[in-house]
Amino acid sequence: MKKLLVASSASAALFAVGVGANAHAAEDNNVNQDQLAQTALNNTQQLNDAPVQEGAYNIAFDNSGYNFNFNSDGTNWSWSYNADSSAQQAPAQSTTQEQAPAAQQAPAQSTTQEQAPAAQQAPAQEQTQQPAQQPAQQQTQQPAQQSADSGSNVQVNDHLKAIAQRESGGDIHAINSSSGAAGKYQFLQTTWDSVAPAEYQGKPASEAPEAVQDAAAQKLYDTAGPSQWVTA
């Protein structure tokens, strides 16, 4: 299905907006990784209520058997973690928030799953296109195993939910063979690259986890409006 494109700078995109280079890169590397990892594992509400630090940052590291990522463009922030390659698989966790201007912090907009006590986990495997799937429902604490791209803690508005159903039936791996549009929201590649995190740019949206697709769609909706989807 043909989409309208949005002109923007791919280098300025981040997790909810795309992740790009910024003047705080050196500062990001000086965070206390042990403390930040423990906060993500045991005090998720603190990360939901406020960013790791003021301004833009892009922090990624391995600690305590998990891979951690913390991102902000100075306005929106997000964080996530999943298991490293040495353990048994358990639910991955991520969240995206909007940062209030200056020193004032905006209230948290989304909830996360409470993480079970630390256990051995294995890395989630990225999947290619799969048969149509229904969106995973957010659940409270569960020990059951699931892949990192199933379900999403990113909250999108009701209009976007309806758009996703009309575009792909909610299938995050859907690909339109005619237009090349891909993913839950049927992004064209150039549009996807303008709002996707750096590590997913240049790849079809269908290869990104559902949380990443949701965050990118909400950003596109907020900045360019629903006219980007012909089914809107």
Swiss-Prot record:
EC number: 3.2.-.-
GO cellular component: extracellular region
Signal peptide: 1-25
Primary site of residence: secreted
Keyword Lipid metabolism: no
Function in brief: Is able to cleave peptidoglycan and affects clumping and separation of bacterial cells.
Protein name: Probable transglycosylase SceD
Lineage summary: Bacteria, Bacillati, Bacillota, Bacilli, Bacillales
